Amino acid sequence: MSVAGKNVVFVGGLGFIGYEACKTLITRDLASLFVFDILDKPEAVKALEEINPKTKVYYTKFDITSKDNIKQSLADVIAKVQYIDVLVNGAGILNDPNVEWTMNINLIGLINTTLEAIPLMDKNKKGRGGVIVNIASVLGLEPGPPAAIYCASKFGVMGFSRSLGDPHYYEHTGIAVVTFCPGLTDTPLKNNVATKYTFDYSKEIGEKLNHSKTQKPEVCGAHLAQVIELRDNGAIYISNQGTLTKVKPSVYWEPTY
């Protein structure tokens, strides 16, 4: 799918991976890019505008934990440009001692944003179809013992996204739902990580993981932009060590009819 002439909403678009993806996407001649973020970085937004002046860039201060804020922010997009073609859910934190905050941002906020956006994008309702990319993690595919709460939130994203990626929904809505899983990437998520583990005695295994090889956010962001353009409904992609790989999940159970 070409994103030229399309309207993109990027939640968490000023984070490291998100911002790099936005920098790539804006070179594709988008009609508009809506950057939703709790962070306020006017210089970063201005830099995006300068990359491609043909694309209109909007910044919205966004609280993903507020259903009212989600509803109003997406309604503002429709009021400005009529359609949402691409939604990227990229907000995320690592802070296992604060269970509610972690789940509210990483999972519940993502779910609420997706459910609010779908009727606006649905080709049989107010929209013209499109693609939703939910950012999970490799720790949404494999256990993450040092950060069990973070891991649980990302497993939740995985289950939610794969469920919405069922062909039945795509046939009705025209919205592809894709899951993107970054591997270890050099971002501030790792800052002060020793205070963010599940237990005090998680530190030993956590520090081993924290000192393993990472990739640059520029590489991961470029992979994310590529996944958006693929519009591969129901798919799962891993970006790890500079390589983008499509995942074929194991099937452990199927209903008997």
Curated annotation (Swiss-Prot):
InterPro entries: ADH_Ceratitis-type (IPR002426), NAD(P)-bd_dom_sf (IPR036291), Sc_DH/Rdtase_CS (IPR020904), SDR_fam (IPR002347). It catalyses: a primary alcohol + NAD(+) = an aldehyde + NADH + H(+); a secondary alcohol + NAD(+) = a ketone + NADH + H(+). One of its GO terms (molecular function) is alcohol dehydrogenase (NAD+) activity. Its EC number is 1.1.1.1. CDD domains: ADH_SDR_c_like. The active site is at Y150. NAD(+) binds at residues 9-33. Substrate binds at S137. Pfam families: adh_short (PF00106). Keywords: NAD, Oxidoreductase. One of its GO terms (cellular component) is cytoplasm. Belongs to the short-chain dehydrogenases/reductases (SDR) family. Homodimer. This is Alcohol dehydrogenase 1. It comes from Ceratitis cosyra. The gene is ADH1.
